[in-house]
C-alpha cells in the first residue's frame, strides 16, 4: 500500500473538503463580528465574550470528537462518515447563525449564543475527522506531501472565493435589506460547501487501518501526550498560527497607516493569497529534492530573516512591500502542507512506539492548539495596539503606535518563524531515513515497544 499512487481526482476530492471548511471559516472570521454588531444589533462586548467562550468549549469538544472518531466503525471507515453526515446540519446552522429573527434584546443574545455555539460544535464534527482523514488515505510520505499540497491550494482558493463573493451576494440578494442579504449569501455559500464535502466523501478512501485497541479514552489521552514528537508539532502549530494571525490582524492597520491607504488592503491581501497558492504547489517538488524537515526549518529561518528585513523597509516603498508580502506568502504556505504531513508522521510514530494508532485524537489536539494560537494572536494585536495609544479617529498616529504596527506585522512573526526553525531542527527527529526504517517495521508488524520502547532511545543514526 505504500507504493499506491493517489489519483489527481482523489487529491482534488480531499482538497475540496478543506476548501469547504475555509468557505465557512474565513467568512466567519471576516464578516461575523460585523454581522452581529451592525446587522443583528448586539453589543460588541457580548460578541467578544461569546467568541472567547467558544474557544473554551473547544478544549472539551475537540478531543472528544477525536476520541469518538477513533472509535467509529462503519463500512465507510472511521472519518469519512462524519464529513458527509455532518455536512447538512453544518450548512443549516450556518444559515441560522447568519439569520436575524425579530426578537427582544435578550432573545437576540440567547439566539446568537445558541446558534454560534452549534456552529462551533458542528465545525468540529466535520473538520476534525476531515483533518484526520489525510493521515489514513495513504502512508506513503511522498504521496502525503502531494495530498496536503493539493489540499492547501484548494483551501486558499475556497477562502478567497468566500471572502470575495460574500458582499456581492449580500447586495444582490438583499439589496437594502442587509439582514436578508447576509442570510441569503451564506445560504448560497453553504450549499457550495456541502457539495464540496460530499465530493470529498465520494472520491476519497481510507487505506491505513489502525490495529485493534480496547483502551479507555483516558489511556488514549495519556498515550498521545507521551508522544514527544506530537508535542513538538503542537508547539510548531501554535507558532505557525501566531505568525499568520498577528500579521493578518495587523495587515489592515499596516496598509492604512504605514502604506497610507486602506484601499490597498484588498490588493495586499490578494497578493499574499496568490503567494499562498504558489507556496502550496511548491511543497511537493521541494520535498522530493530535500528531506521535508530540512525544507521546513530552512524555510522558517528564511521567513524570519525576510520578516526582520521588512521592518526596515521605508514607509513610502510601496512596491517593495508588495514584493515582500508576496514572497512571505509563498514561503509561509510552503511549510504548511509539510507541517500537516509531520503530524501524520507523529501518528505513525505513536503506533510504532506503543501499537496504538490514535489518528483522530492526534489531529484534534493539533487543531485545538492552533485555536489557542489564533486566540493568543488576536489578544496580542489588541494588547499592543492599546499600549501604543492607537486612536482610530485620528488622522495620523504617533510614532510609538506606528512602530508597534510595523513590529506586529514583521518582528513578532519573525520571532515565531525563528523559534519554529530552531525547534524543528533541534527536537523534531522524524526525518526521512528514520521514517523509512520505522515504516518498514510497521509494515512487518514490528513495534519499538516489543523491545522495551520506554527505555530505549531512538537510534541516533536514523535521526540525521
Map each language-model feature to its residues:
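Membrane-embedded alpha-helical bundles of multi-pass transporters/translocases
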Residues: 2-464
Amino acid at each position: 500500500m505504500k507504493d499506491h499512487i493517489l489519483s489527481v481526482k482523489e487529491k482534488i476530492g480531499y482538497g475540496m473538503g478543506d476548501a469547504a471548511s475555509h468557505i465557512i471559516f474565513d467568512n466567519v472570521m471576516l464578516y461575523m463580528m460585523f454581522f452581529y454588531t451592525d446587522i443583528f444589533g448586539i453589543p460588541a462586548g457580548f460578541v467578544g465574550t461569546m467568541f472567547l467562550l467558544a474557544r473554551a468549549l473547544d478544549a472539551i469538544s475537540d478531543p472528544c470528537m477525536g476520541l469518538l472518531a477513533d472509535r467509529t466503525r462503519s463500512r465507510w471507515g472511521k472519518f469519512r462518515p462524519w464529513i458527509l453526515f455532518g455536512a447538512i446540519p453544518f450548512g443549516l446552522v450556518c444559515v441560522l447563525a447568519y439569520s436575524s429573527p425579530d426578537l427582544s434584546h435578550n432573545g437576540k443574545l440567547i439566539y446568537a449564543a445558541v446558534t454560534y455555539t452549534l456552529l462551533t460544535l458542528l465545525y468540529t464534527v466535520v473538520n476534525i475527522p476531515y483533518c484526520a482523514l489525510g493521515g489514513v488515505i495513504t502512508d506513503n510520505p511522498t504521496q502525503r506531501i502531494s495530498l496536503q499540497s493539493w489540499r492547501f491550494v484548494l483551501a486558499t482558493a475556497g477562502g478567497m472565493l468566500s471572502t470575495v463573493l460574500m458582499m456581492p451576494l449580500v447586495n444582490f440578494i438583499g439589496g437594502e435589506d442587509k439582514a436578508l442579504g447576509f442570510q441569503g449569501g451564506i445560504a448560497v455559500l453553504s450549499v457550495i460547501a456541502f457539495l464540496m464535502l460530499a465530493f470529498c466523501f465520494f472520491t476519497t478512501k481510507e487505506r491505513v487501518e489502525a490495529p485493534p485497541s480496547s483502551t479507555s479514552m483516558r489511556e488514549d489521552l495519556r498515550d498521545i501526550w507521551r508522544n514527544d514528537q506530537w508535542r513538538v508539532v503542537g508547539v510548531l502549530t501554535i507558532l505557525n498560527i501566531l505568525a499568520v494571525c498577528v500579521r493578518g490582524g495587523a495587515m489592515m492597520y499596516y496598509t492604512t497607516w504605514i502604506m497610507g491607504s486602506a484601499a490597498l488592503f484588498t490588493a495586499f491581501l490578494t497578493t499574499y493569497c496568490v503567494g499562498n497558492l504558489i507556496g502550496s504547489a511548491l511543497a511537493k517538488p521541494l520535498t522530493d529534492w530535500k528531506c521535508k524537515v530540512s525544507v521546513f526549518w530552512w524555510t522558517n529561518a528564511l521567513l524570519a530573516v525576510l520578516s526582520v528585513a521588512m521592518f526596515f523597509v521605508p514607509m513610502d516603498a510601496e512596491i517593495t512591500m508588495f514584493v515582500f508580502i508576496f514572497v512571505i506568502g509563498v514561503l509561509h504556505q510552503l511549510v504548511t502542507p509539510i507541517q500537516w504531513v509531520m503530524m501524520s508522521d507523529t501518528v505513525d510514530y505513536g503506533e510504532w512506539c506503543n501499537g496504538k494508532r490514535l489518528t483522530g485524537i492526534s489531529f484534534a489536539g493539533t487543531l485545538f492548539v492552533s485555536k489557542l494560537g489564533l486566540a493568543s494572536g488576536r489578544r496580542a494585536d489588541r494588547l499592543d495596539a492599546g499600549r501604543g495609544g492607537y486612536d482610530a479617529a485620528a488622522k495620523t498616529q504617533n510614532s510609538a503606535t506606528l512602530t508597534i504596527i510595523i513590529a506586529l506585522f514583521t518582528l513578532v512573526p519573525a520571532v515565531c518563524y525563528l523559534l519554529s526553525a530552531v525547534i524543528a531542527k533541534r527536537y523534531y527527529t522524524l526525518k526521512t531515513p528514520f521514517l523509512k526504517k520505522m515504516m518498514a517495521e510497521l509494515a512487518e508488524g514490528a513495534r519499538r515497544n516489543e523491545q522495551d520502547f520506554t527505555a530505549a532511545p531512538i537510534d541516533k543514526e536514523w535521526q540525521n
